[in-house]
Amino acid sequence: NLVKSSVENYTDLTTPLWLKNCDSSAITADDTIFCSTEEEGNKAFRNFEERGVETWIAQSHQNGDLIKFYGVEGTDFFHWNYASLGHSKFGHEKVNGKEKGYQFCADKIKRYADKMAQKLNVPIYGGDVIIDEKGDFWFIDFNDFPSFSICREKAAKAIALRIVQ
């Protein structure tokens, strides 16, 4: 669902979309901006330009259930939960609304997440996926060494095992 990934020629983007600052990790709510209209998109781009953001991506918005996941590549550990059950960093979860409980295969998400972890050399990871009504999913975020706060005790054993491997 990647739409663009440079500061050139952003006038042909279609909303709704998410504009994400790639110069650094998301520190403020303005580093990841939901744009439901072209006007909001233009405002978000002006915000990035004023802040000197040079590298960004625009992702098309996907409707569905927002799932947070945590994993440790090379182990059996994988935890997921609906975004509404955990801590909200900036409140962007509200865009997709209340989860509908769409069915999906967590093992399949784990397999793909482990492949990304291997390619990126990020064995201790977390992220977000959107699940649609058919059970299809889109990775929308992938992080190295997230907090694991919602599953800390179970994760600690897998993290320790992975570190000594």
Residue ranges and their predicted role:
Residues 1-32:
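A conserved helix-loop-beta module that forms one wall/lid of the active-site cleft
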Residues 3-8, 61-64, 123:
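Short beta->alpha connector loops
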Residues 14, 73-74, 134:
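Residue-level signal for tight coil/turn positions that link beta-strands
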Residues 17, 77-78, 125, 138-141:
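Protein kinase-like catalytic core scaffold
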Residues 22, 61-62, 70, 128-130, ...:
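Anionic group-transfer/hydrolysis microenvironments
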Residues 30-120:
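Phosphate-binding site of ATP-dependent enzymes
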Residues 56, 67, 122-134:
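A short glycine-rich, hydrophobically flanked beta-strand micro-motif that places a catalytic Asp/Glu
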Residues 104, 118-122, 131-165:
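C-terminal active-site "lid" helix and adjoining low-complexity regulatory extension at the edge
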